[in-house]
């Protein structure tokens, strides 16, 4: 299946890179360094990790923060993996099927947006937790665990157990499943380079429903936010919330993958995931560094 014209392919063709404009590269590098050295708005939010890497080579363009190797809950960023599973297994068929109805008793802490009939595109856009649960139930525990293992996704621990959100009921939501930002980068590169053990249709549909929008300088961004907190019982602590934004950005033959993780030290009105997304997207022009301008990871 071919992607529609409005959703360009996010992976680079095997072609030579354009000539590097040294002055532009140095200016962009300076901007990126300044951006990564600055914490998100608000003294009560910490940047645990920001990584940007070339999708084709894996070369790290920038790395900052002391939490890049530390595993935490993936929260709703795991929907990218769930999308690949669902489309590969045939549980999901296209961006608008299946449409599942909201039923009394489903999690609805996301408000009215979660109390609507939901299809895969709406699920990803509004991060509808109960749709994830319905997907994993249709996969079944064995297939769900097998996919997670084969994806090499963090600790791949989605084993069933006691608790409201154990196993396929929500292991990714402050549960047993954990992943580090560096592991997110490896997983995202496998998506961009299409090396995961799933069908072309699964890649194409996941690409379609994760599209964010076009950014300055012609970059096309795909990604997913996530908001959760420490612990393994699915309970949310607003005063210590994690905020993720992970994904990939492409322009022409170049693609980068990114993972940005923050943590709050006090409650906020706007979710940590949305704030992580906005902070990362604001710096996207600086992420458009040519490969020759790459820098080693900051330690």
For the regions a language model picked out, list residue spans one by one.
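N-terminal secretory signal peptides that target proteins for export/translocation
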Residues: 1-21
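Structured C-terminal helix/loop/strand segments within mature extracytoplasmic catalytic/sensor domains
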Residues: 47, 56, 67-71, 137-140, ...
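Short, well-structured active-site flanking segments
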Residues: 88-105, 198-203
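Flexible glycine/proline-enriched surface loops and loop-helix/loop-strand junctions
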Residues: 63-69, 116-117, 125-132, 163-173, ...
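Short N-terminal segments immediately surrounding and downstream of signal-peptide cleavage
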Residues: 43-62
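Mid-domain, small-residue-enriched loop/turn segments at the edges of structured enzyme/sensor domains
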Residues: 111-120, 134-193
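Active-site SXXK
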Residues: 58, 71-98, 123, 184, ...
